[in-house]
Amino acid sequence: MRAQTLVFVRGTNLQLYRGSRTQTGWSGWASMGGLLVDAAGVGAPAAGQADVVVRATDASLRTRTYRDGAWSPSYQLSWAAGPLPAPPAGRLGVDWTRIPTSSKVVALTFDAGSDAAGLASIRTTLTSRNIPATMFLTGAWVRSYPALAYQVADTGFLVGNHSDTHLYLTQRTDAQVTAQVTNAETTIFRTTGVTGKPAFRFPYGDVNARVLADINRLGYVPVRWTVDSLGWQGTSGGMTTAKVVSRVLAALQPGEIVLMHLGANPTDHTTLDAAALPTIIDRIRAQGYTFVTVQSLTG
């Protein structure tokens, strides 16, 4: 990544941790999870030795050592992502429209499938107010904006899978549905180093019992929404910032899942969700609510 430094360290618990520094500052240390392939066999570098760690295209970490004026023959596998647990059985068979809770929590979610015109503003609003959020990314969007996709994950937002090319999945075969999901997952993981599992959002909200079963079989919990802000319709579709705020507040309830978008309306190029977000957050907070990701739903 441009203007970014990644640092990997082994903790006293023998787990691997990652930190990064960009123009915006130091991220702090975050556990990588996964599998330490070399376990405790690799200690601190010896005097006169340098260990170089790189991330491979499969998101694994590989280490090469420079010692006594020469490099080791090849990069050795040091870390690989571990298998994820299966979604909770109680979360299967449903395209969830809200988090099942009586607590006053709201999940802000953002779909990324077109452009990224609103992302900078949305990211600034969320980070400056310390608000967690969930970003549903398509594989196509990640391939178009790899640096921004990495930034989304590195900022700490929860990442979900929104299919590869945003098709109506009920019109596809089971094999095609599988390809849409797995291709997106591969792209997300290789680009960002994080998985989109287990949160999945159907493109257009297009779902039936067959494709719902497909998604569950692939290890995902579908996350729909309680309210669509309709900011994506833009001013050309009759929406305004005030209307976006009103729609979200009118649906306010414990466990509300709000759908917004990172991109602009393709006709008028407005980013109403980004513009409305500060007011939405302030007014929801004023009613005693806090914000969560959908992780409490997906497990």
Feature-to-residue mapping (PLM):
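Active-site beta->alpha N-cap acidic-glycine motif
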Residues: 84-172, 176, 180-197
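Short, glycine/serine-rich, charged loops/turns that create anion-binding
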Residues: 12, 57, 113-114, 140, ...
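Catalytic domains of cell-wall/extracellular-matrix polysaccharide-remodeling enzymes
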Residues: 121, 143-144, 166-290, 295-299
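A structural motif
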Residues: 1-83
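Short, well-ordered coil/turn elements that cap or connect secondary structure elements
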Residues: 2, 128-130, 154, 217, ...
